[in-house]
From Swiss-Prot:
Official protein name in the record: Homoserine O-acetyltransferase 1
Residues with site note (Important for acyl-CoA specificity): 111
Entry GO CC: cytoplasm
Keywords (A to Z) from UniProt: Acyltransferase, Amino-acid biosynthesis, Cytoplasm, Methionine biosynthesis, Transferase
Function summary: Transfers an acetyl group from acetyl-CoA to L-homoserine, forming acetyl-L-homoserine.
Amino acid sequence: MPIVIPKKLPAFDTLKGENIFVMNKSRAFSQDIRPLKIVILNLMPNKIVTETQLLRLLGNTPLQIEITLLKTRTYASKNTSQDHLTSFYKTFEDIKNHTFDGLIITGAPIEHLQFEDVDYWEELKEVMEFSKSNVTSTMHICWGSQAGLYYHYGIPKFPTDKKIFGIFKHKIFNLKTKITRGFDDEFLVPHSRHTTVMRGDIENVPELEILAESEDAGICLVATRDRKHIFISGHLEYEKDTLKSEYFRDLDKGRSIDIPKNYFKDDNPENDPVVTWRAHAHLLFSNWLNYCVYQETPYILK
């Protein structure tokens, strides 16, 4: 089944060219199907890139998905055109009286800030509070996962000695849980972050379950036991060249940056990256949509 997005959204033609089933709203409305309503709070600077990455994964399931893109009202993006934001994005004020099957809160390159110092922190708190009653299941990604753990459970983030940067191996702790159904015993995830959360802080919260961890990158996948909240410290949605772009961007700016680990062939930046995480990315999003959202949400959203 398709993902339902506006035909003029840049991701529409990109995904259609990849043979991902996309459908415009006029065609979707002619079908007698209740689509899953998913809202994406996009906090990343380049919103078009991020929305395309996420829609690619959401569009590869048997379920019809209707997407709402959300931006912050209290902070204006400097890397995405105002025309794009006006055409395709809503604010929390527009949706606060609605209910959704799923919510995705993306990462944001603001790890150096305390949560309370983030320009849109109060607005983000409103969205996370809204998710308790108006969303069936929420997926938090990278900084979004740290923000969610902090807001809901008071779990702080800590700076790392060096940037966690590259593709890292993770071990599954519970092969029977549905969110990782079909996963291999070990799987690879891209990471790009300067902060982390501590295992002990998560273990002190009975509602939380650690599902996957890396010896080198730390905790990767955490969920509430009712799967209402999923927290992912990495970026399974990343494309082949995303870390490459970050690496050369930082080099061009004269920043001290290590070569991303386990990413370029032979660890040589002159070689192409090797994609080793794509299958598990699709599987995680498919499992989330099926087991945490579709199987749990009411047919009629109130």
